[in-house]
């Protein structure tokens, strides 16, 4: 493979991975701006509707150290296709469901695959370039994380308020389906080259710095999600602003993030 061809392949890979991370984060974070709409659509209280965010986040927290480990020896393309397929199917079901319990299930199942896809996206980006360029490659993928918060939340809020909750779920489905097809047809097979034993991988859990990092991430995200999840309901209840204004405020908040 020539250098120019390899560079084109890497650019395409980075684009697909970045868009994939955006789709995954968009599915996770997009609903935080439409909690009141979910409550109204499914006839539940706002705190109950908040479980669409809390349940997703809790499952990620507990599955993140385990699920990537279980799939660490499987072809990376296969794993990404599996994760994206779960997201597409779950999002598609959420488009049509009128049952709140079913909605929670469609939120819970893909949450297990969230850390799986995101971890592979970051590691694949880093390993696809030289060691010197790895930080730059990872930063590109992280743009998908930022976009999920900066664009995903306000866009979802706007779509749900102007059309319907189902329309917002269609948005989730289309983004993830596009990435799924791009992954299937444009990304080559990526077998795992270095297969570490599960014991070797688990040994990292003995490092205090890891648990300190876990705690810091837990506290930061708990504060952010706690504020972010109920911001729209607070603004509607206290200030009586429209969802168009809320979408703009969510965009500003996402930019600050």
Q: Where are the regions a protein language model picked out?
A:
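Helix-breaking motifs and short loop linkers at transmembrane-helix boundaries and internal kinks
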Residues: 43, 75, 96-102, 240
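Extracytoplasmic gate region of multi-pass secondary transporters
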Residues: 211-250
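Cytoplasmic helix-loop-helix junction between adjacent transmembrane helices
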Residues: 106-144
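Extracytoplasmic
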Residues: 13-46, 64-67, 228-232
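Helix-loop-helix hairpin linking two adjacent transmembrane segments in secondary transporters
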Residues: 102, 131, 139-185, 230, ...
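Paired small-residue
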Residues: 90, 101-109
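Conserved MFS/SLC helix-loop-helix module at the cytosolic interface between two early adjacent transmembrane helices
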Residues: 62-98
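Residue-level signature of mid-helix packing/kink "hotspots" within the transmembrane helices
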Residues: 29, 57-65, 149-150, 254-257
């Amino acid at each position: 493979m020539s250098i120019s061809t390899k560079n084109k392949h890497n650019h395409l890979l980075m684009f697909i991975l970045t868009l994939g991370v955006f789709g995954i984060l968009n599915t996770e974070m997009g609903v935080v701006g439409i909690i009141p709409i979910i409550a109204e659509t499914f006839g539940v209280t706002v705190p109950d509707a908040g479980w669409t965010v809390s349940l997703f986040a809790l499952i990620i927290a507990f599955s993140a150290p385990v699920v990537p480990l279980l799939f660490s020896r499987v072809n990376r393309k296969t794993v990404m296709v599996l994760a994206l397929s779960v997201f597409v199917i779950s999002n598609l079901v959420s488009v049509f469901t009128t049952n709140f319990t079913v909605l929670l299930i469609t939120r819970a199942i893909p949450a297990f695959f969230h850390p799986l896809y995101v971890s592979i996206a970051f590691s694949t980006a880093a390993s696809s370039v030289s060691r010197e360029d790895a930080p730059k490659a990872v930063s590109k993928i992280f743009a998908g994380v930022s976009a999920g918060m900066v664009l995903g939340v306000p866009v979802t809020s706007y779509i749900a308020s102007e059309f319907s909750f189902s329309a917002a779920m269609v948005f989730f489905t289309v983004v993830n389906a596009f990435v799924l097809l791009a992954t299937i047809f444009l990304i080559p097979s990526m077998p795992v080259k270095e297969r570490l034993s599960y014991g070797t991988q688990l040994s990292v859990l003995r490092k205090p710095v890891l648990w300190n990092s876990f705690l810091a991430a837990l506290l930061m995200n708990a504060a952010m999600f706690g504020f972010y999840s109920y911001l729209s309901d607070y603004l509607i209840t206290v200030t009586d602003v429209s969802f168009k204004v809320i979408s703009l405020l969510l965009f500003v908040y996402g930019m600050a993030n």
